[in-house]
A protein has these predicted regions:
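Active-site glycine-centered loops adjacent to acidic/histidine catalytic or metal-binding residues
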Residues: 31, 128, 150
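Catalytic-core segments of class I nucleotidyltransferases/pyrophosphorylases
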Residues: 167-229
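Conserved donor-nucleotide/metal-binding helix-loop-beta segment in metal-dependent transferases, i.e.
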Residues: 133-155
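Conserved beta-strand segments of alpha/beta enzyme cores
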Residues: 46, 94-96, 167, 229
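Conserved N-terminal catalytic core of the sugar/cofactor nucleotidyltransferase
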Residues: 7-27, 35, 49, 53-126, ...
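A structural signal for short hydrophobic beta-strand segments in well-ordered beta-sheet cores
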Residues: 47, 160-162
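Short N-terminal binding/cap micro-motifs at the start of the first secondary-structure element
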Residues: 33-38, 155
Length: 229
């Protein structure tokens, strides 16, 4: 199900950078939504209506209202429906569609956008994440941030441990024995994208996977280890 959670903590994961004039949003929506069947037999999960509009519109509207005008959608299952919906609903936005033909994880999905992003800062919002938070404040911040939320059982999530100053010390994807109950909610503002793509490449070269997938969490953990964040 979609994640209905507040942006409980904004965890600083980066050095201070000048605020970008423009920022691209990356929204992975390639999943088949098997947990929501039969609803997703004929439509992608992102187009399921919640509280009067689709999950995808909740996400796009929030980012658009904060000033983001360029979106990269990573599509796969029933991707043509998402592409048609976005073009009809948001004709004034600059949109790109990248196909993830084999769902190999969030890290693999983001890596597919490299040519469109280059080394520009990005805001990544997983396509089933609905949250209430001040997007503009996060975009305008000169630091990279990750959204987290306390949960009772974080073993099915990426998990963050933080220091006394609110900086991330460690990130682990779906740990069997979590060191904290701070789960990643699927919202990421990343300034150091050149390092991000370097770490994603490292995942593929070294075949670093969690439960058979290349995860964005593991790439962010790599960034921490490199000392760039």
């Amino acid at each position: 199900m979609p994640n209905f959670t507040n942006f409980e903590a904004l965890i600083n994961v980066g050095k201070s950078y000048s605020i970008p004039q423009f920022m691209k949003a990356v929204i992975p929506v390639a999943g088949a939504g098997t947990k929501l069947r039969p609803l997703t037999y004929t439509q992608p999960k992102a187009l399921i209506p919640i509280a009067g509009k689709t999950i995808l519109s909740h996400i796009v509207d929030q980012l658009k209202d904060a000033g983001i005008t360029e979106f990269i959608f990573i599509v796969g299952y029933l991707g043509a429906k998402i592409q048609d919906y976005v073009k009809q609903t948001y004709p004034d936005l600059t949109t790109h569609f990248v196909y993830q033909n084999e769902r190999q994880g969030t890290g693999h999905a983001v890596e597919l956008t490299k040519q469109l992003i280059g080394d520009e800062p990005i805001f990544v919002a997983l396509g089933d994440t609905i949250c209430e938070f001040d997007v503009k404040e996060i975009i305008d911040s000169p630091i990279s941030m990750i959204g987290v939320h306390k949960v009772d059982d974080p073993r099915s999530f990426g998990v963050a441990t933080i220091d006394d100053n609110g900086f991330i010390e460690q990130l682990v994807e779906k740990p069997s024995i979590p060191k904290s109950n701070l789960a990643l909610v699927g919202l990421y503002k990343i300034n150091e994208t050149a390092v991000l793509f370097e770490c994603l490449k490292q995942l593929f070269v070294e075949n670093i996977t969690t439960r058979g997938e290349y995860n964005l969490t593991d790439a962010l953990a790599c960034m921490l280890q490199k000392g760039t964040t």
